[in-house]
């Protein structure tokens, strides 16, 4: 008989991240070049828009990840130690990870899968979509918080400290960081989550090697991306104190810009004014965004072989296993701490 009890959601937030976003928005808009923080894009509605965008036919990263998982999840499951705590750092795409979970169940691996997300409602819907009654060996739970909250929880929770840990970073998550910050983030994961049982603990992540501008820009301008981008402005308006009818942003004043940066090997997503200089609403009314000025909100770095090697070495990690498929630019990498 499978799991019958509904999975439990643990609130591991050490502070409410929503409270810090307005300060991050203001700081980003006062910097040069102007930016918006990533947290602004992960409201419940923002995540739903992203999921619709990532399911578009031209959005190759998701389709390639699923192809590889369908064909090679059994081998991936074999690489995860029995008794592991599996933490999915960003659990919005259940349709991907379900292939790995089913392979772990088939292998009779006694693991606990924790979905981590910023959105409580998205966590709830993710867990409700898992057919838990079909699983006996795999247990399910969830963590409500940020990446940092999740790593702190792994390190400081006595009952799981010394168990093997497997951190999932699907969806090209690591590509959203600058190259130095990506290495620092992986190094932080290693120091907080892989040290309790280092020989059996690992990170399982995806990276994209595609540097063909037409393929990349077609993917990142696929259906659904404009509502995703503009939803961030609506969400921002809810986080700032209201002054009558005035709002900080009017989403109708902005449009989405997609560019490939040849020098840095990354896709860049920005919002720019539609037709004129824009003075923001109170309390950011001292900020003016010029007509052709970009507010960058996202980058997706692509990694060739040399850049991957440098990333892993800088993080103090080495790849022990690679899962790829002919014709796919996305691949899965299992990383472990370098032996001392």
UniProtKB/Swiss-Prot annotation:
Pathway: Alkaloid biosynthesis; ergot alkaloid biosynthesis. It is an enzyme of class 2 (transferase). Disulfide bonds: none annotated. InterPro entries: EgtD_Methyltrsf_superfamily, MeTrfase_dom, MeTrfase_EgtD-like, SAM-dependent_MTases_sf, SAM_MeTrfase_EasF-type_put. Its EC number is 2.1.1.261. It catalyses: 4-(3-methylbut-2-enyl)-L-tryptophan + S-adenosyl-L-methionine = 4-(3-methylbut-2-enyl)-L-abrine + S-adenosyl-L-homocysteine + H(+). Keywords: Alkaloid metabolism, Methyltransferase, S-adenosyl-L-methionine, Transferase. It comes from the Eukaryota. The keyword Transmembrane helix does not apply. GO terms for biological process: indole alkaloid biosynthetic process; methylation. Belongs to the methyltransferase superfamily. Homodimer. NCBIfam families: methyl_EasF. This is 4-dimethylallyltryptophan N-methyltransferase easF.
């Amino acid at each position: 008989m499978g799991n019958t009890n509904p999975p439990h959601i643990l609130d591991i937030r050490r502070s409410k991240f929503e409270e810090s976003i307005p300060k991050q928005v203001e700081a980003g808009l006062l910097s040069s070049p102007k930016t918006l923080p990533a947290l602004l894009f992960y409201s419940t509605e923002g995540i739903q828009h992203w999921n619709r965008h990532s399911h578009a036919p031209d959005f190759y990263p998701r389709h390639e990840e699923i192809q590889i998982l369908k064909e090679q999840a059994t081998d991936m499951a074999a690489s995860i130690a029995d008794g592991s705590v599996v933490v999915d750092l960003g659990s919005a795409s259940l349709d991907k990870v379900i292939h790995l979970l089913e392979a772990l169940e088939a292998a009779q691996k006694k693991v606990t899968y924790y979905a981590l997300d910023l959105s409580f409602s998205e966590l709830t819907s993710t867990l409700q979509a898992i057919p838990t009654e079909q699983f006996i060996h795999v247990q399910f739970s969830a963590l409500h918080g940020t990446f940092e909250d999740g790593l702190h929880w792994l390190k400081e929770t006595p009952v799981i400290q010394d168990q093997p840990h497997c951190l999932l970073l699907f969806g090209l998550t690591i590509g959203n960081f600058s190259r130095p910050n990506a290495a620092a983030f992986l190094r932080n994961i290693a120091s907080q989550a892989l040290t309790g049982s280092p020989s059996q603990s690992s990170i399982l992540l995806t990276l994209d090697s595609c540097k063909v501008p037409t393929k990349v820009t077609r993917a990142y301008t696929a259906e659904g991306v404009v509502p995703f981008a503009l939803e961030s402005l609506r969400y921002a308006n809810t986080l700032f104190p209201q002054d009558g009818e005035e709002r900080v942003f009017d989403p109708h004043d902005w449009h989405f810009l997609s560019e490939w940066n040849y020098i840095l090997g990354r896709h860049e997503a920005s919002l720019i004014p539609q037709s004129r200089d824009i003075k923001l609403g109170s309390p950011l009314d001292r900020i003016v965004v010029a007509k052709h000025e970009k507010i960058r909100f996202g980058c997706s770095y692509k990694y060739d072989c040399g850049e991957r090697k440098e990333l892993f070495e800088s993080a103090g990690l080495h790849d022990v296993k690679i899962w790829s498929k002919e014709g796919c630019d996305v691949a899965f990498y299992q990383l472990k701490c370098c032996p001392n």
